[in-house]
Swiss-Prot record:
UniProt binding sites for GTP: 14-19, 131-134
Reaction(s) this enzyme catalyzes, per UniProt: GTP + H2O = GDP + phosphate + H(+)
Keywords: Cell membrane, GTP-binding, Hydrolase, Membrane, Nucleotide-binding, Protein biosynthesis
Subcellular location(s) of the protein: Cell membrane
Keyword Cell membrane part of the UniProt annotation: yes
Species this protein is from: Hamiltonella defensa subsp. Acyrthosiphon pisum (strain 5AT)
Protein name: Elongation factor 4
Membrane topology per record: Peripheral membrane protein
Molecular function per GO: GTP binding; GTPase activity; guanosine tetraphosphate binding; ribosome binding; translation elongation factor activity
Top-rank taxon, per record: Bacteria
EC top class named in words: hydrolase
Family: Belongs to the TRAFAC class translation factor GTPase superfamily. Classic translation factor GTPase family. LepA subfamily.
Record domain tr-type G: where: 2-184
Underlying gene: lepA
Length: 599
């Protein structure tokens, strides 16, 4: 037990966490030179393309320290993006310590801070590491002061390294072995294993990543899932080196994977505890706090035949991504699909892309919305995640929107631009603190404004230097309205949106004008209207196609022409009464993209 170390790396995006993990794996001989690909732990194609870590990965390595002992290092990689903070908290729950990696040129960023506080709350030992010291712009002394000033941990003897060139990697490992405590636990006690992550393998069924807190686990043991009471036989056990490597036993304090031939996708939920069926533990381990999705959107398969495979794909994906929420939804315009909850827009994009790539589905997404709290006239409280579920205006006493507390860290020279952006997003300043060259801003901004494009706009106004961390603060009464889109007085449920009354007219007008370009002309006029309740705020008309019924009349009496025109007019009237306006698929897609561009 004394020669085991469980740790993870916390860092902001692009501070060199994946490169550092590559070097550590290389130094400990986890992979041969030939097998060593850069960013070896970012195994998903998407991760490599975007250059971000999405899923937490784990590796077991052996390191011969200078004191002559060989240490077993169980290392869990974590994502750095704000949308995947839940993955980080899960990884940290399995560790005793964390390496806080900070770019020696850029300094501390908001996300690093948030993840570092999560680690300190869990009583983990945090070891600061200054990376990228080979860059000409690096200033390790200033950044060390910044870490002490902003994060509040002692960084006077922070390890300095360059993951790219390999300088100082051995020092990082020595410090890790020295400062991070060995795991606590009773090897002879009853088995308690925490499920950190699960994924679905077509051949093996559910594969779970586990951390043994107490006891040992052997191949052939019968284990019980404590939340469901189900009993399974352990068929395979092992560790990642980062390749999957089979072993016969997992000891106390180790991190490994296990296969129990669980075919039911919900058989072993993440955050659950496994114990032996013959000597069950008295109580489960404290799991993870459930995360609430912040953004909701409808996902619909383009072909209705794909509905079943879409449902299976979502179930398999939610096993691997515990923060994804979904429930069936039926839309008059788009048919059957699912209402899905995500942690943010990047999370939504990644999920949609994974569904399309890994499960070969073609999907349509409706515009994303946040959850609103509604107080009805009958004093009931409802939570609404879709505009179509919002009660009529006459039944609503108060509509409250979610407010996010945003912590923004940025260099002083961009302060003016960022404050202007926050005000434009209906933000209220709460706090402002200067740390040397950096400024820490705290704003309360409506969640709907934050999740849509605030992150991108913040990056562009500050040339990429500002960083953001946000969390849900409270619901606050606000003058929000639902804007409905009507086609020939018929409401189209999938196009409704909830917005602030001040922006309603402009958003409605914009949407109506854009739709006019995408709806094909019919034999009768099509009125496209945007309405709040019964009040029409914008309108556009798609003009009718008209057949020339007088073409066959050569001269002749005017009453004959009038009769033909009158007949055509009545026909058009009848057609308009019974005619349906079909919305083409690309009109939907275009409308949703327009919403994103214009905000």
């Amino acid at each position: 037990m004394n020669y085991k170390r469980n740790f993870s790396i916390i860092a902001h995006i692009d501070h060199g966490k994946s490169t550092l993990s590559d070097r550590i794996i290389q130094l400990c001989g986890g992979l041969t030179e030939r097998e060593m690909a850069s960013q070896v732990l970012d195994s998903m194609d998407l991760e490599r393309e975007r250059g971000i870590t999405i899923k937490a990965q784990s590796v077991t390595l052996y390191y011969q320290a200078q004191d002559g002992n060989t240490y077993q290092l169980n290392f869990i990689d974590t994502p750095g993006h704000v949308d995947f903070s839940y993955e980080v908290s899960r990884s940290l729950a399995a560790c005793e310590g964390a390496l806080l990696v900070v770019d020696a040129a850029q300094g501390v960023e908001a996300q690093t801070l948030a993840n570092c506080y999560t680690a300190l709350e869990m009583n983990l030992e945090v070891v600061p590491v200054l990376n990228k010291i080979d860059l000409p712009a690096s200033d390790p002394d200033r950044i060390a002061e910044e870490i002490e000033d902003i994060v509040g941990i002692d960084a006077t003897d922070a390890v300095r390294c360059s993951a790219k060139t390999g300088i100082g990697i051995a020092d990082v490992l020595e410090r890790l072995v020295r400062d991070i405590p060995a795991p606590k636990g009773d090897p002879k006690g009853t088995l308690q294993a925490l499920i950190i992550d699960s994924w679905f393998d077509n051949y093996l069924g559910v594969v779970s990543l586990i951390r043994l807190k107490n006891g040992t686990l052997r191949k052939g043991d019968k284990v019980k899932v404590m939340s469901t009471g189900q009993i399974y036989n352990v068929e395979r056990l092992g560790i990642f080196t980062p390749k999957r490597f089979d072993t016969d036993i997992l000891n106390c304090g180790e991190v490994g994977w296990l296969v129990c031939a669980i075919k039911d996708i919900l058989g072993a939920p993440v955050g659950d505890t496994l114990t032996l069926s013959r000597h069950p533990a008295e109580k489960p381990l404290p799991g993870f706090k459930k995360v609430k999705p912040q953004v909701y959107a409808g996902l619909f398969p383009i072909s209705s035949d794909d509905y079943e495979s879409f449902r299976d794909a979502l179930a398999k994906l939610s096993l691997n991504d515990a923060s994804l929420f979904f429930e069936p939804e039926n839309s008059g315009a788009l048919g059957f699909g699912f209402r899905c909850g995500f942690l943010g827009l990047l999370h939504m994009e990644i999920v949609q892309e994974r569904l399309e790539r890994e499960y070969h589905l073609d999907l349509i997404t409706t515009a994303p919305t946040v959850v609103y709290e509604v107080k009805t006239v009958k004093k009931e409280i409802l939570y609404v995640d879709s505009p179509s579920k919002l009660p009529a205006l006459s039944e609503i006493e108060e509509l409250r929107e979610p407010i996010a507390e945003c912590h923004i860290l940025l260099p002083q020279e961009y302060l003016g631009n960022v404050m202007t952006l926050c005000v434009a997003k209906r933000g209220v300043q709460v706090n402002m603190v200067y740390h040397g060259h950096q400024v820490a801003l705290t704003y309360h901004i409506p969640m709907a404004e934050v999740v849509l494009d605030f992150f991108d706009r913040l990056k562009s106004t500050s040339r990429g230097y500002a960083s953001l961390d946000y969390n849900f603060k409270r619901f606050q009464a606000s003058d929000m309205v639902r804007v409905d889109i009507l086609l020939n007085t018929e409401r189209v449920d999938a196009l409704a949106l909830i917005t602030h009354r001040d922006n309603a007219a402009s958003r409605g007008r914009e949407l109506v004008e854009k739709m006019k370009d995408f709806i094909p002309r019919q034999q009768f006029d099509i009125a496209i209207q945007a309405a709040i309740g019964h009040h029409i705020i914008a309108r556009a008309t798609v003009k009718q196609l008209r057949k020339n019924v007088l073409a066959k009349c050569y001269g002749g009496d005017v009453s004959r022409k009038k009769k033909l025109l009158q007949k055509q007019k009545e026909g058009k009237k009848r057609m308009k009464r019974v005619g349906n306006v079909e919305l083409p698929q690309d009109a939907f897609l275009a409308i949703l993209h327009i919403g994103k561009e214009s905000k």
